[in-house]
Amino acid sequence: MSEISRQEFQRRRQALVEQMQPGSAALIFAAPEVTRSADSEYPYRQNSDFWYFTGFNEPEAVLVLIKSDDTHNHSVLFNRVRDLTAEIWFGRRLGQDAAPEKLGVDRALAFSEINQQLYQLLNGLDVVYHAQGEYAYADEIVNSVLEKLRKGSRQNLTAPATMIDWRPVVHEMRLFKSPEEIAVLRRAGEITAMAHTRAMEKCRPGMFEYHLEGEIHHEFNRHGARYPSYNTIVGSGENGCILHYTENECEMRDGDLVLIDAGCEYKGYAGDITRTFPVNGKFTQAQREIYDIVLESLETSLRLYRPGTSILEVTGEVVRIMVSGLVKLGILKGDVDELIAQNAHRPFFMHGLSHWLGLDVHDVGVYGQDRSRILEPGMVLTVEPGLYIAPDADVPEQYRGIGIRIEDDIVITETGNENLTASVVKKPEEIEALMAAARKQ
């Protein structure tokens, strides 16, 4: 279960209810199970919005929040009934009797009876909040219940006349992390950092990329994070220039770099770190020259990110650092200001500098036009500058095929930011020292 307290989940539900109209109900559905092949399923992963309000990790569940008026509201959970045979085969179920105490909801009803029960809860209300289009099974249930109400006027049934998507409201709530959430994210960052450190220590020429992937996942598991928060990227050599490379199947060669973008999922929350280091433990001059530009971009971002700034504003400073550095190396040619105006950096830095982080690795929340939203305390985001010199790029030969990204996770505080992932080294000399020490053991 979640390390978020029951009281926090109750506060979140109350915060949503306070933004709902009187005479309304919000329906939040659990994620369905997903088939991997034939009769095998992927490990179950709960819908992040449902988890945000419940911390409940079973499928076939619906949270119903009902606001009768400004002073009366209640919560109902539909979930699976206890079934001893099913539980022998597939694991324990919470059931209805234990759910109110465990989850802090007012009452629990059997999911198998939702078509018979939900229409009674919605009868006479004016508004239903529902994330239409998210899950087909959820739409089928909601549409069936509403149609039953519409056709039941002779039985004194009335359907809500308005349907509103709750996602804009909920996703704005999720953008601002509570102290409890930040504590879990901090732990996710610590575990992820330990895994990246392990990868640096274990790396040797002749290993395959999937060997480091295994080392990383092993470290996640050792600390109670069973799954990565996204598909792990271990790209050596030219593979580091592929942003979402996940094949992880090539032999790592002496003299190449390896870019690892990996994060654990801990109690539902994501870590997300990237480190790039030499397979043999020693940067070449060309690798170091590109690395220093990326590192300066990251360190400048960490100094600048604070309340009142924006991703757009900080990105502008990073682009100037990158363009200036690439001009000095002869990779770009011309006036720095003119090159920036021409977006000349885009072939080498083609992704965003930052994204929100939380229950989803690319977390929800509005960024604003061109990521111009002003940052506020409680927002959690990544900082991930990178430079990728394609193998066939028209640049000095020594730089071709070099891909470097360095990424940390930060939370915006009242006075600046806290780096949640600072415990894994990123300065070149520190990386080399760590890898050299590991080789002596």
Named regions from a protein language model:
Residues 1-441:
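Active-site neighborhoods and metal-handling regions in enzymes and metal-associated proteins
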